[in-house]
């Protein structure tokens, strides 16, 4: 910009915002510019910038804008790759292709940037949905971005391993149900690796239609079995069957030795924790 000014080269009217380093700019900052009324965003890097990082942010922002029919409105220029004349020309070419943003004059929502970055990002995307009234259909499978879909099959025993390890609350347990909020998932894969039954499958995917959903979905709700004593529903059938298998396997390994036979242990397994104690001393 200084070089362009010294040479008195004409370029489109811009509002320069200086940051300590362009690497500090994320997709949330870029999308917030459109929330504040920008028609487009130009990012000017320097020779010390980590271009891969900012290119990722630019790609996501352009995908988000395109998902809501706003088109690509973010342009990255590397300072090390152009002189003053090139900068002026590239800027002019970019601005020439820009149309006024359809949401530029709409009510601006105040974004709380002290919240976790993912919460801010989801709020910005939901604002785009609300303002454009477009239900996005853009999906990128095997995405480089930290989003994933999770599936749980019938082997799940509701052991809580995945829920306990999920630091973003993408997975939660409600009664005997495991629920999933797609927007909260950061694709870390801990749930998949932690599942002792190998019942969880995680697939990387960026699905903008699910980012505008505020409610989660139930991944699994296994059948519960009733206590043979009091009739209370107390254990999932999958857990009952899995524990029964382990007890039978243990019988073969131990030669049937123990205070209780496998048959007796299997019988006690049919009772809830309250009835089991009294049944064991009969």
Residue ranges and their predicted role:
Residues 1-2, 6, 66-67, 72-174, ...:
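Ferredoxin-type iron-sulfur electron-transfer modules and their immediate structural context
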Residues 19-21, 151-155, 175, 180-186, ...:
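Short, contiguous acidic/charged loop-to-helix segments that flank catalytic cores in large enzymes
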Residues 47-51, 79, 180-183:
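Conserved short loop/turn motifs at secondary-structure junctions
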